[in-house]
């Protein structure tokens, strides 16, 4: 079991701690469990800190680079753009980087960006992307070991907690 809810809540806490209050989220597809958990975790953690996300700051996308570009165009070309964007995967975050570059918005000086999954792409973007790491190798290794150990017996649940990998894509808002 992965704890997408907790990973997204950690992002909300981090951005709020930096001083961001005008935050947007680019979600995955509404029918994906991971997107539901990430969105609930993120929005819930912000609400606990007194930050409500307007509907215009929550944009559903498709976990692709192209959908990240489309969502970022809506967010970053509006008169009042957010100071931070949480993307529920790194591909969509790369789409935000593309639009920021094209529109002259500097990351992180004018816009903080956080991704999810900590894919190899996260460390290759410039500046390197802050992202939530889900140790999928550990998850697979644990699951395989549990299958081998349990045979036909009831299988216990294993969980791997995500954690935020802080790189250079965030700073306090100007």
Enumerate the predicted regions with their spans:
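Bacterial carbohydrate/catabolite-sensing allosteric modules
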Residues: 1-174
């Amino acid at each position: 079991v992965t704890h997408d809810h907790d990973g997204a809540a950690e992002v909300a806490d981090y951005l709020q701690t930096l001083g961001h209050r005008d935050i947007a989220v680019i979600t995955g597809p509404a029918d994906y469990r991971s997107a539901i958990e990430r969105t609930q975790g993120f929005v819930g953690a912000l609400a606990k800190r007194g930050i409500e996300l307007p509907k215009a700051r929550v944009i559903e996308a498709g976990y692709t680079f192209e959908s990240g570009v489309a969502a970022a165009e809506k967010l970053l070309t509006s008169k009042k753009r957010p100071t931070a964007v949480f993307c529920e995967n790194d591909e969509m975050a790369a789409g935000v980087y593309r639009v920021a570059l094209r529109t002259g918005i500097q990351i992180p000086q004018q816009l903080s960006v956080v991704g999810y999954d900590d894919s190899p792409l996260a460390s290759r973007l410039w500046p390197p992307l802050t992202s939530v790491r889900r140790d999928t190798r550990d998850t697979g290794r644990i699951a395989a070991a549990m299958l081998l150990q349990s045979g036909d017996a009831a299988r216990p649940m294993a969980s791997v907690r995500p954690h935020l990998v802080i790189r250079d894509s965030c700073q306090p808002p100007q």
